[in-house]
UniProtKB/Swiss-Prot annotation:
Keywords: Cytoplasm, Hydrolase. Its EC number is 3.5.1.5. Pathway: Nitrogen metabolism; urea degradation; CO(2) and NH(3) from urea (urease route): step 1/1. GO terms for molecular function: urease activity. GO terms for cellular component: urease complex. Disulfide bonds: none annotated. Belongs to the urease beta subunit family. It catalyses: urea + 2 H2O + H(+) = hydrogencarbonate + 2 NH4(+). It is found in: Cytoplasm. It comes from Cereibacter sphaeroides (strain KD131 / KCTC 12085) (Rhodobacter sphaeroides). This is Urease subunit beta. Pfam families: Urease_beta. The gene is ureB.
Amino acid sequence: MIPGELFPADGEILLNAERAQIALVVSNAGDRPVQVGSHYHFAETNPALEFDREAARGMRLDIPAGTAVRFEPGQTREVRLVSYAGSREVYGFNGRIMGKL
C-alpha cells in the first residue's frame, strides 16, 4: 500500500440515497454573498436568504461533506436538501432548535 492510495469500490456510490429529500427555491435578498456549508441546518441560515424555512427544518444541503453553496446578492437558485440522520438533534447554529427536531 502507498500512503494516500485509494481503493474505490466498483460501481456508483450514491450519497444520502435512503434519506428524505426536497428541492427548494432560495433567493438572496441581501447585498452580500451568503455561503452555506454542507452540514449547516438550512432552516437557520442567514435571514437574507428567502425560502420556506419550515420545509427546511431538520435538513441540510445534499452536497458532499466539506463543500458549500454560495448565493450571490439577488441570485435565485434551486437547492436539494436532505434530512439529518442519527439522533436528529440540532444544537448551535443560530440557537433556534437546541435539541430534538
